[in-house]
Amino acid sequence: MKWGINMLNREIINALLDIKAVELRVDKENWFTWASGIKSPIYCDNRLTMSYPKIRKQIAEGFVKKINELYPNVDYIVGTATAGIPHAAWISDIMDLPMLYVRGSAKDHGKTNQIEGKFEKGKKVVVIEDLISTGKSSVLAAQALQEEGLEVLGVIAIFSYNLNKAKEKFDEAKIPFSTLTNYDVLLELAKETGLIGDKENQILIDWRNNL
């Protein structure tokens, strides 16, 4: 996976920093704890973007551009529950495509569906995520779609921490993935703007490289 830097990468990181969707804590005693149990100096809450029309539109247009470049033959846009659902809705509206969403697991009531929406087996889908950390939940969502007979062209997220274990999970599952922006761009801009210095930058690089 080549983590490219372009203007869209930078614009989205700037927007996430402006609305405090990304928070950095270089003091190890104050690090965040992810749901996976990983201790982290960074927390990215892309759900906040829903509350900012200009930013969510910019993100949706970024998704559409990437989908058109990578997967122009897509049939359905699929959001992951819950944070990927609104972005999938905005994307599918712009592209005039059907939308589905996929849960982390099947319901234990009603029709016990894991995938919601009407679909035909054999159709091509792109999965929309707000965030890729370890890649586990994204891969499980994509595999659930494959098990129902859908062809997963790839997973696209707003942001990735660029963790090696995420790349390994996607490679093992043979599922392509890409993002609108990523951890490397975040560190570059944080340093440029004085949000972090050389010492803090190295702490953040070492944390990522050691996972």
UniProtKB/Swiss-Prot annotation:
Q: PROSITE patterns from the xrefs?
A: PUR_PYR_PR_TRANSFER (PS00103)
Note the CDD domains from the entry.
PRTases_typeI (cd06223)
Give residues annotated as binding 5-phospho-alpha-D-ribose 1-diphosphate. R103, K107, H109, E129, D130, L131, I132, S133, T134, G135, K136, S137
Q: Name one GO molecular function term.
A: magnesium ion binding
Pfam families listed in its UniProt record: Pribosyltran
Entry's Gene Ontology BP terms: 'de novo' UMP biosynthetic process; pyrimidine nucleobase biosynthetic process; UMP biosynthetic process
The entry's keywords: Glycosyltransferase, Magnesium, Pyrimidine biosynthesis, Transferase
Per its UniProt record, what InterPro entries does this chain match?
OPRT (IPR023031), Or_phspho_trans_dom (IPR004467), PRibTrfase_dom (IPR000836), PRTase-like (IPR029057)
Known cofactor(s): Mg(2+)
Q: What is its EC number?
A: 2.4.2.10
Pathway stated in the Swiss-Prot or TrEMBL entry: Pyrimidine metabolism; UMP biosynthesis via de novo pathway; UMP from orotate: step 1/2
Task: Tell me what reaction this enzyme catalyses.
Answer: orotidine 5'-phosphate + diphosphate = orotate + 5-phospho-alpha-D-ribose 1-diphosphate
In this chain, orotate is annotated as bound at: S133
Q: Can you tell me which family this protein belongs to?
A: Belongs to the purine/pyrimidine phosphoribosyltransferase family. PyrE subfamily.
**HAMAP family given for it?**
PyrE
Mind telling me which NCBIfam families this protein's record contains? pyrE
The role this protein plays is: Catalyzes the transfer of a ribosyl phosphate group from 5-phosphoribose 1-diphosphate to orotate, leading to the formation of orotidine monophosphate (OMP).
**Classification via PANTHER family:** OROTATE PHOSPHORIBOSYLTRANSFERASE, URIDINE 5'-MONOPHOSPHATE SYNTHASE
> What binding partners and quaternary form does the record give?
Homodimer.
Q: What is this protein called?
A: Orotate phosphoribosyltransferase
